């Protein structure tokens, strides 16, 4: 997957997240399904940003960015920030 494809997915997920959160503001709050979807979006965004950072780091180091792999959510979600 190319950087542009990753960024496109990030943008689409961010738009969906904003749409869901806006709907929640217009109503009493998020439904259980909406809340679950927002949580899933956040995890997938973390995974995609991690993949993009890996690709950029490999490129900067003179390595092939295509060898970067999307990490499991359990790994990415446990990164310390």
Label every model-predicted segment:
Residues 1-81:
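Extended, charge-rich alpha-helical interface modules
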């Amino acid at each position: 997957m190319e950087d542009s494809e990753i960024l496109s997915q990030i943008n689409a997920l961010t738009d969906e997240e904003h749409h869901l959160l806006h709907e929640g503001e217009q109503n009493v709050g998020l439904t259980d399904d909406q809340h679950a979807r927002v949580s899933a979006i956040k995890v997938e965004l973390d995974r995609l940003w991690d993949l993009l950072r890996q690709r950029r780091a490999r490129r900067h180091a003179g390595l092939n960015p295509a060898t970067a792999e999307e990490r499991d959510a359990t790994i990415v979600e446990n990164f310390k920030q």
